């Protein structure tokens, strides 16, 4: 949520800032702006709406300069407007700030600053920052920022410039993402890697309450006591092309079709036929695994749905009790945690605020934490005891696809890893599941090559206002993800229900023409699922069925059925969900929705 870019270098800042902000559009925003230093003055241009509005404004009134900060805003305090857009400045426009996060004590700070003679123009929490920095400024911008931050409560990633020190950008973060990039042509700050990939792949990850001083000549890092510190430079392996559409109409479609490779990459070196599973970034011992008495899987949104699949997998493979929690609920419910409790957190970005808070809460009371994330060096990765990366590559579309399927792969890997250490599955059983896993990339390609039925169903149902998704067991977990995908990008009301719950109330919603998507991939409950489908079709529902090859009977009771290749039942969610992703995509396209940037949503939810 919100995107920050800062630059100091040899080139014109305006074009670099706008380009960087365009690479952060996936994070969600409602306004945009830049502040650029030139001839000892700060020039600000900002406006409500899409980034193109800012581009047009800068074309009409160009701003020269080689140092500046830019921002895309997601409204939290104050409505979307030109006035509330960032950057925000102090009264005499000598200090400008961009901010991602929430200042929790801004009302107290605002009242205190007003008592000191400061005035406020916007409704935002951010505006207290430039005024605080101004209050503490005594000739050194870094010192003033450190003192100002000592008064602030909440989350923040900040980029700050001052006409009093026009050669630098000062930045700091706490609970909101911020990286630093370096190159021969200049140096950068940004909320995420794609913003600066066209210029550099050499980056630093910033920890909470570490301060950055960025100039055209270099970068310096400081502790919150103002002491200089050294940081490790990291090199990003993927390049800017990975964050481009590559000929696809939308990022989401590209990322759906990248899933076979993402699945293969996530298994590489971890799932090898005839060899034990070895996880290099996980140090948990066999004895510790044997002593685990309970696992909490904690996540938000799509990652939560992957966690629900993980519950089925780990309990079946490793026979360990698993509870799945929404992160924003977990941290407030006083969970029962012992020294033998394991927490697994899932977060694509590694910066999800609620997940990070839940992780820290669990660690503070003694739980060991394994993080599953797609971003190396992210806050979640740094805070956890052990890490299991999903090698999905950059995911730009707001609606997650390949991050979800690779999270499923990590659940299978962990389930087998625990089973291997607890001896709850024989070596033969583990090898058989691994053999099936190794076929998933090829079978995923097969699924994605047959899209005609789902396209046709989308074309015939996109005008409906409601859709229902049904499943039993692990299929119910997949149904939840399918319903979320549809509502995220098509704005159609969609809900998932367990098949056995139909007669306990939900069936009252079924009438002539109601659209239902029914998953029946699990062999042990397939016949029961077919019976559930009959319950809705006899009441006039229009049903798309999804089943594994070799299952009989569904084609007789649904309007259309899509078969996915047969593998171990536990692995079928990887294949069946791809048809649900395609359904959501094609329904959204039929409706003319903004597939990659749906309304009101942000890719990375970095505020609670």
UniProtKB/Swiss-Prot annotation:
InterPro entries listed in its UniProt record: GATase_2_dom, GFAT, GFAT_N, GlmS/AgaS_SIS, GlmS/FrlB_SIS, Ntn_hydrolases_N, SIS_dom, SIS_dom_sf
Catalytic activity: D-fructose 6-phosphate + L-glutamine = D-glucosamine 6-phosphate + L-glutamate
Annotated keywords: Aminotransferase, Cytoplasm, Glutamine amidotransferase, Repeat, Transferase
PROSITE patterns: GATASE_TYPE_2, SIS
SUPFAM superfamilies in the cross-refs: N-terminal nucleophile aminohydrolases (Ntn hydrolases) (SSF56235), SIS domain (SSF53697)
UniProt key word Secreted: no
Subcellular location: Cytoplasm
GO BP of this protein: carbohydrate metabolic process; fructose 6-phosphate metabolic process; protein N-linked glycosylation; UDP-N-acetylglucosamine metabolic process
Enzyme Commission identifier(s): 2.6.1.16
Limits of the Glutamine amidotransferase type-2 domain: 2-217
GO (cellular component) term, any one: cytosol
MF terms in GO: carbohydrate derivative binding; glutamine-fructose-6-phosphate transaminase (isomerizing) activity
Positions of the SIS domain: 285-424, 453-598
Active site: 2, 603
Function: Catalyzes the first step in hexosamine metabolism, converting fructose-6P into glucosamine-6P using glutamine as a nitrogen source.
NCBIfam families in the cross-refs: glmS, PRK00331.1
Subunit: Homodimer.
Stated name of the protein: Glutamine--fructose-6-phosphate aminotransferase [isomerizing]
């Amino acid at each position: 949520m919100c995107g920050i870019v800062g630059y100091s270098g040899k080139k014109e800042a305006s074009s670099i800032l706008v380009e960087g902000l365009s690479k952060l559009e996936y994070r969600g925003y409602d306004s945009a702006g830049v502040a650029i230093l030139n001839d000892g003055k700060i020039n600000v241009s900002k406006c409500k709406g899409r980034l193109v509005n800012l581009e047009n404004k800068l074309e009409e009134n160009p701003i020269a300069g080689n140092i500046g900060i830019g921002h895309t805003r997601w409204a939290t305090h104050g409505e979307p407007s030109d006035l509330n857009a960032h950057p925000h400045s102090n009264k005499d426009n000598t200090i400008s700030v961009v901010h991602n996060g929430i200042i929790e004590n801004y009302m107290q700070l605002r009242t205190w600053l007003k008592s000191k003679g400061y005035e406020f123009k916007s409704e935002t929490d951010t505006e207290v920052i430039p005024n605080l920095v101004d209050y503490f400024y005594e000739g050194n911008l870094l010192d003033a920022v450190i003192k100002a931050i000592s008064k602030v409560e909440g989350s923040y990633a900040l980029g700050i410039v001052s006409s009093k020190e026009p050669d630098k950008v000062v930045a700091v973060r706490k609970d909101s993402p911020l990286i630093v990039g370096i190159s021969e042509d200049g140096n950068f700050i940004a909320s995420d890697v794609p913003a600066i990939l066209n210029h550099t792949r050499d980056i630093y990850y910033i920890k909470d309450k570490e301060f950055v001083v960025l100039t055209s000549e270099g970068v310096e890092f400081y502790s919150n006591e103002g002491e200089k510190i050294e940081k490790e430079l990291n090199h990003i392996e993927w390049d800017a092309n990975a964050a481009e559409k590559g000929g696809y109409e939308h990022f989401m479609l590209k990322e759906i079709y990248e899933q076979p490779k993402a699945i293969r990459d996530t298994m590489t070196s971890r799932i090898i036929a005839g060899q034990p599973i070895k996880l290099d970034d996980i140090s948990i011992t066999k004895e510790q695994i044997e002593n685990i008495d309970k696992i909490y899987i904690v996540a938000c949104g799509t990652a939560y749905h992957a966690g629900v699949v993980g519950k089925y997998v780990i309990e079946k493979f490793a026979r360990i009790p698993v509870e799945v929690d929404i992160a924003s609920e977990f941290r407030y419910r006083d969970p029962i945690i012992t020294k033998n409790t394991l927490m697994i957190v899932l977060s694509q970005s590694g910066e999800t605020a609620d997940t990070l808070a839940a992780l820290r809460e669990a660690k503070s009371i003694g739980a060991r934490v394994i993080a599953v994330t797609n971003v190396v060096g992210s806050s979640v990765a740094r805070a956890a005891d052990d890490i299991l990366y999903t090698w999905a590559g950059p995911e730009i579309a707001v609606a997650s696809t390949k991050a979800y399927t690779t999270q499923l792969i990590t659940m299978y890997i962990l389930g087998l890893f625990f089973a291997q250490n607890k001896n709850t599955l024989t070596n033969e059983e583990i090898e058989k599941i691994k053999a099936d896993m190794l076929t998933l990339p090829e079978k995923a390609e097969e699924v994605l090559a047959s899209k005609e039925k789902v396209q046709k169903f989308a074309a015939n149902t996109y005008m409906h206002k409601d859709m229902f998704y049904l499943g039993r067991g692990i299929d119910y977990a997949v149904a939840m993800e399918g319903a979320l995908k549809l509502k995220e990008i098509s704005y159609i009301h969609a809900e998932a229900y367990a098949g056995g719950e139909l007669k306990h109330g939900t069936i009252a919603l079924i009438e002539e023409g109601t659209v239902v998507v029914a998953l029946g991939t699990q062999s042990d409950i397939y016949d029961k699922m077919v019976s559930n489908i009959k319950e809705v079709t006899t009441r006039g529902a229009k049903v798309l069925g999804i089943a594994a090859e070799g299952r009989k009977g569904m084609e007789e009771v649904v309007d259309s059925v899509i078969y996915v290749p047969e593998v171990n039942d536990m692995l079928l969610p990887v294949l069946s969900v791809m048809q649900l992703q395609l359904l959501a995509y094609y329904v959204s396209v039929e409706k003319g929705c903004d597939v990659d940037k749906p309304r009101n949503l942000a890719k990375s939810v970095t505020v609670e």
